[in-house]
Regions:
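Short helix/loop capping segments that flank catalytic or ligand/cofactor-binding pockets
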Residues: 84, 132-133, 140, 145-151, ...
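Active-site neighborhoods of enzymes that stabilize oxyanions during catalysis
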Residues: 159-289
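Short glycine-enriched, charge-decorated loop/helix-capping segments at active-site entrances
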Residues: 89-94
């Protein structure tokens, strides 16, 4: 149970949204805003994501420490995610991002020293990036094998989850495949023929302690240089309008392409070749799994 929280929670309206952060104690976010201004969601995610989001978060961290002096404080600095996905870990842009984050951490340490506040700082990484140059579309594969069903509504192709025998929820280099009973073998055999990494059925998931009740009936991992996209349409003109925008709720999976803006169409790109960094596969060289 946390006593102090600030986390983005925009209020979605009919054709817009109000940027807001949920906070605890009540009105703590509003107090922070008085000192450093509103948290701008477009800095945090989307084609305009930048170090400004991390700067705001570090400044909010300083205010939290100064006003509440918590015993334990977790702060998420998102900046490395942007260059990591757009350019990959081998890029000069990613190295620049590392230096920028290093400066932010240094700034926080200097603040703690100036306040004579004794804190031990532990820096944790959620994941390591892999350089990628390929993308796989599990939902298109299921669609082409008549396992994922779609409906044409207003000239656009939408997934019919009720009638589908299987569909994929994609997240970077991992894809959860949800399958109706009786089709597990068929789906598994289809993906065994694809250029992917591994397939984990429920038995293998249990062995690896990843058999959550919400896990897919099978879980796919990609090859190291590849990642999974959520796309299901085979003709670009049939793609629903929301797929061209930053829309984290209606897409069946994470979409790194939301970091890319197509200047010609003024929309989010569908060009999977733009992504150069991803994560999620098991590092066999450094893992006991």
């Amino acid at each position: 149970k946390s006593d102090i929280i600030i986390t983005p929670k925009p209020l979605h309206l009919e054709n817009n949204f109000v940027m807001w952060c949920y906070s605890k104690p009540e009105n703590f976010y509003e107090d922070v805003v008085k000192e450093i201004g509103e948290f701008d969601l477009k800095w945090y995610w989307g084609p305009f994501a930048s170090i400004e989001s991390s700067k705001w978060i570090i400044n909010a961290t300083k205010i939290t420490i100064k006003n509440h002096n918590p015993d334990l404080l977790f702060t998420y600095i998102p900046h490395l995610d942007y260059a990591g996905q757009k350019h990959g870990p081998n890029s000069a842009e990613f190295q620049k991002s590392l230096s920028e984050v290093d400066e932010l951490i240094g700034d926080l340490i200097e603040f703690l020293q100036s306040e004579n506040t004794e804190y031990e700082i532990i820096i944790l990484s959620e994941y390591g990036f892999n350089q990628v140059d390929n993308s796989i579309s599990p939902n298109i594969i299921l669609n082409e094998n008549s396992l994922l069903q779609t409906r044409n509504i207003g000239g656009k192709e939408y997934i019919d989850f009720e009638l589908s025998k299987a569909f994929a929820m994609c997240d970077h280099q991992i894809a959860h495949i949800f399958i109706k009973p009786g089709f597990e073998k068929t789906v598994t055999e289809i993906f065994e023929k694809q250029p992917i990494g591994e397939i984990f059925d429920k038995n293998k998931q249990k062995e690896l302690h990843i058999d959550n009740e919400r896990s897919g009936d099978i879980i796919l991992t990609s090859e190291k240089n590849s990642w999974f996209n959520y796309h299901w349409w085979t003709d670009e003109k049939n793609a629903p309008d929301f797929t061209f925008s930053v829309d984290i709720h209606r897409k069946p999976g994470f979409d790194p392409l939301e970091l890319f803006f197509d200047m010609k169409t003024k929309t989010i790109s569908h060009d999977t070749s733009l992504v150069h960094g991803s994560h999620g596969i098991i590092d066999k060289e450094n893992s006991k799994l």
